[in-house]
């Protein structure tokens, strides 16, 4: 074996310096340089083996030397120096390297350095025959340079390598001239030395009990640690200054060399992780494959290390030529900073930018502030205006399209079919559907509590990129372009159906498929009424002509210009509280932001005296508005068990009446309601016949309605923190006072009994005032947002209704994945579930986060 290669193997495992005769061997037979052992004793007041942690009872000076090492070094010194062909430059470099290693060598005093200096220079740095001493490459082709700063060379030139910009570009020197050149133009003769395995601290790691945690290595944020080895799945050993200890892997960010070291020492039982970590690994392999295909591209964030970040920031050698799709996941602060310049994100934590043919999707770090984001593009099969309308104010109604387009619904609902009835003939137009992009409308206002949260305003549109498992959404405001997170139960999905029509009236329909808000541009005033179909059943149906004039929209919600009116279709897995408070109609496009102006649905309870006869007398009232003006029925019948149901009387079909068909289903607190356009005229004999039938039906329905409040309770809201229970309880109590928790009972086949109630609007405002209780709320009371958790995967986690137990944290615990909680000593945790493997699921009282943690770190109180 060559002497230089042998000397490279004889290095201290702690400081990585070459060992000399002063090195000491411990009783466990591990050898270290004397300087490292003295540093350990001075910092910890005891000596433990850095490799196996065995306690050494004697002092450092009393330890024996490694006899085999001493003999090996003596043999190398006594060998004559070989005549090399490295050249004067290589020899001078060897002298400098030998002198540098001589001055920093472990355990040698000054007298030994001076006395044996020349011998060590000769022994340490003999030139190797045929191998150059500097990292260099040989030019395979001529390169003239394409940009200023490129290094020009001819075929056969030897180029000294200075640093590697990325996997496609080098920075080198030839004849005193520095510049950049592509990797595929040269052949690497001697590669650049690998950077030392290092890591950067992302958080502060403090040790409270120095006696119990004496093996831990405390550090502060942004400290640079030298990585020695991986201890187990969650801990690594490293050195900071003259201190050596273990530290949690999740607290640091490794460079490329340290990642390789950690992967080599990885235990066999450790998997790649779940959620986002698996995505990162797959994206890394995809990124490497794309990089091999595009060898002439100058953009790469993969090979940057912390050793060259200063020079990288000076030499801006990147261009944004990225072949879509590619996922850029940067662990280097400089690269993350360059990404953040393009996306407007903070570089305080690693960012991910996904660039594809359909747009730019930015995943900000959890701690990044809410800042302005980029513009977005959408799938080619859906027009821009059909997907979102105009992003920038002032908003105008979209122009008529030759082909009607609808951006469709949730996964559970069938494709919407819009029917236009012209006389006896019926023409059915099937509209194309698309599930992208995910556009949501805010149904509650929300004031942000943290810097990375978005402010929600009623009716404001949002584009959602990710749905976190804790119930929070990550997206951008379509008005301000700000990117952030917001509670998912404060918004509802939106689909927009555009027809070749001009503005008409506004109707309201609610169904029980999924939590969806459908914005529809209806037909012109002269056109026939529309019907919506879903799952084969007609949700909107024109039956009777016995109705009353609708309640008009308040002036604050009506557009001054004849803009396109919007039909608000809310359906879905909503809670009862949301069903009673969140149903609103969208008035038209706002002039300053894309909002849906809404009016709350008030709970109108008909009294026992409201019978079909009284409803018939109200038919003579003319409609208050006509023409293209917008109408809306602002009252929805939610019958109580003690109140008879007023049924409708059928009449001639000369003009349609307002009727509400409440089709209740299990798991849904909403009714499917539709309203024809006009009011009716006189009654006929068919109306009297239906009165008798409805009275019989009413008696049967009253039996079904009795006792419903004790059989069924409102569904709980999305996951919430125990500290927010008071707010939720107050909201539910107020809502029960307003409308009562009455939901129809379940039949034997599992469905809830359905009933048809008439929207008797004899005097809408008087009825609301008469039936309003002191505890009722006519405004929308938003439910509490779910507690924040790191965003890792799509979908939501349902709330656990089991009783909570209070636990106190006795030992701090750093989270090892995004699904785990960070525990600090003294924290209070509300435990929802105890798993068989010893892990608990609970909510942290300090910040309201819900996640998993080991049960051995807490105690019951």
From Swiss-Prot:
A zinc finger (RING-type) spans 12-53. One of its GO terms (molecular function) is zinc ion binding. It is found in: Cytoplasm, Perinuclear region; Cell projection, Lamellipodium; Golgi apparatus, trans-Golgi network. Residues 268-319, 684-731 are annotated as: Disordered. It is an enzyme of class 2 (transferase). Gene3D superfamilies: SH3 Domains, Zinc/RING finger domain, C3HC4 (zinc finger). Pfam families: SH3_1, SH3_9, zf-RING_UBOX. Autoubiquitinated. Ubiquitinated by SH3RF2, leading to proteasome-mediated degradation. The RING finger domain is required for ubiquitin ligase activity and autoubiquitination. This is E3 ubiquitin-protein ligase SH3RF1. The gene is sh3rf1.
């Amino acid at each position: 074996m060559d002497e230089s290669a042998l000397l490279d193997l004889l290095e201290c495992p702690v400081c990585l310096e070459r060992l000399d005769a002063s090195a000491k061997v411990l009783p466990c037979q591990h050898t270290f340089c004397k300087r490292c052992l003295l540093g350990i004793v001075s910092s910890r007041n005891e000596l433990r083996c850095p490799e196996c942690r065995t306690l050494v009872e004697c002092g450092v000076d009393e330890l024996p030397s490694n006899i085999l090492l001493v003999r090996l070094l003596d043999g190398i010194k006594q060998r004559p120096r070989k005549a090399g062909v490295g050249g004067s430059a290589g020899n001078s470099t060897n002298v400098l390297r030998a002198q540098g290693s001589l001055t920093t060598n472990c355990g040698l005093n000054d007298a030994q350095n001076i006395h044996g200096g020349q011998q060590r220079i000769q022994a340490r740095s003999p030139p190797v025959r045929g191998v150059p001493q500097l990292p260099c490459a040989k030019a395979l082709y001529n390169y003239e340079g394409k940009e200023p700063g490129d290094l020009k060379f001819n075929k056969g030139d030897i180029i000294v390598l200075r640093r590697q910009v990325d996997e496609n570009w080098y920075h080198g020197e030839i004849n005193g001239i520095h510049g950049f050149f592509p990797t595929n133009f040269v052949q690497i003769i001697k590669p650049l030395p690998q950077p030392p395995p290092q890591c950067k601290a992302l958080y502060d790691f403090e040790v409270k009990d120095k006696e119990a945690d004496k093996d831990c290595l405390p550090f502060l944020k942004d400290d640079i640690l030298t990585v020695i080895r991986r201890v187990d799945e969650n801990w690594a050993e490293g050195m900071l200054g003259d201190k050596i200890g273990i530290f949690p892997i999740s607290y640091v960010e490794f460079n490329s060399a340290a990642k390789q070291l950690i992967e080599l020492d990885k235990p066999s039982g450790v998997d790649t992780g779940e959620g986002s970590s698996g995505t990162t690994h797959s994206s890394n392999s995809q990124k490497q494959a794309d990089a091999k295909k595009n060898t002439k591209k100058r953009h790469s964030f993969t090979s940057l290390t912390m050793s060259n970040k200063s020079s990288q920031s000076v030499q801006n050698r990147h261009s944004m030529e990225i072949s879509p799709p590619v996922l850029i996941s940067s662990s280097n602060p400089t690269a993350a900073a360059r990404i953040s310049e393009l996306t407007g994100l903070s570089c305080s934590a690693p960012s991910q930018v996904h660039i594809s043919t359909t747009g730019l999707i930015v995943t900000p770090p959890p701690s990044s502030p809410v800042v302005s984001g980029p513009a977005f593009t959408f799938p080619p099969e859906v027009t821009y205006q059909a997907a979102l309308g105009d992003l920038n104010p002032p908003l105008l109604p979209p122009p008529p399209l030759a082909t009607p387009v609808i951006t469709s619904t949730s996964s559970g609902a069938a494709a919407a079919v819009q029917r236009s009835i012209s006389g006896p003939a019926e023409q059915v137009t099937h509209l194309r559907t698309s599930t992208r992009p995910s556009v949501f409308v805010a149904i509650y206002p929300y004031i942000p509590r943290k810097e990375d949260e978005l402010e929600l305003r009623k009716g404001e549109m949002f584009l959602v990129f990710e749905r976190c498992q804790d119930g929070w959404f990550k997206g951008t405001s379509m008005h301000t372009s700000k990117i952030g997170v917001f509670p998912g139960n404060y918004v509802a999905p939106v689909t927009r159906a555009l027809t070749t029509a001009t503005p008409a009236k506004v109707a309201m329909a609610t169904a029980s498929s999924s939590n969806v808000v459908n914005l529809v541009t209806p037909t012109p005033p002269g056109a026939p009424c529309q019907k919506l179909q879903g799952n084969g059943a007609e949700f909107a149906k024109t039956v009777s002509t016995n109705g009353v004039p609708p309640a008009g929209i308040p002036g604050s919600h009506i557009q001054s210009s004849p803009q396109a009116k919007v039909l608000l279709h809310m359906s879905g897995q909503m809670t009862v509280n949301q069903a009673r408070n969140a149903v609103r109609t969208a008035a038209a496009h706002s002039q300053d932001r894309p909002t849906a102006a809404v009016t709350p649905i008030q709970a109108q309870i008909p009294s026992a005296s409201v019978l079909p006869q009284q409803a018939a007398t109200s038919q003579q009232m003319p409609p208050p508005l006509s023409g293209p003006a917008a109408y809306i029925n602002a009252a929805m019948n939610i019958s109580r068990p003690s109140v008879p149901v007023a049924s409708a009387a059928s009449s001639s079909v000369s003009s349609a009446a307002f009727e509400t068909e409440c089709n209740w289903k299990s798991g849904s607190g909403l009714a499917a309601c539709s309203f024809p356009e006009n009011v009716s005229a006189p009654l006929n004999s068919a109306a009297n016949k239906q009165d008798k039938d409805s009275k019989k039906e009413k008696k049967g329905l009253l039996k079904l309605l009795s006792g419903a409040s004790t059989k069924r309770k409102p569904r709980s809201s999305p996951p919430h923190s125990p500290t927010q229970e008071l707010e939720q309880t107050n909201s539910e109590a107020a809502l029960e006072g307003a409308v009562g928790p009455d939901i129809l009972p379940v039949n034997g086949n599992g469905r809830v009994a359905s009933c048809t109630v008439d929207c008797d609007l004899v005097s809408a405002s008087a009825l609301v005032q008469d039936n309003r209780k002191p505890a009722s709320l006519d405004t929308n009371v938003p439910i509490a947002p779910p507690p924040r958790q790191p965003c890792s995967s799509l979908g939501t986690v349902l709330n656990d209704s089991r009783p909570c137990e209070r636990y106190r944290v006795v030992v701090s615990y750093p989270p090892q994945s995004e699904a785990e909680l960070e525990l600090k000593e003294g924290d209070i945790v509300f435990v929802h579930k105890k798993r068989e493997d010893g892990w608990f699921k609970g909510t942290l009282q300090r910040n309201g986060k819900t996640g998993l943690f080991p049960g051995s770190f807490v105690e019951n109180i």
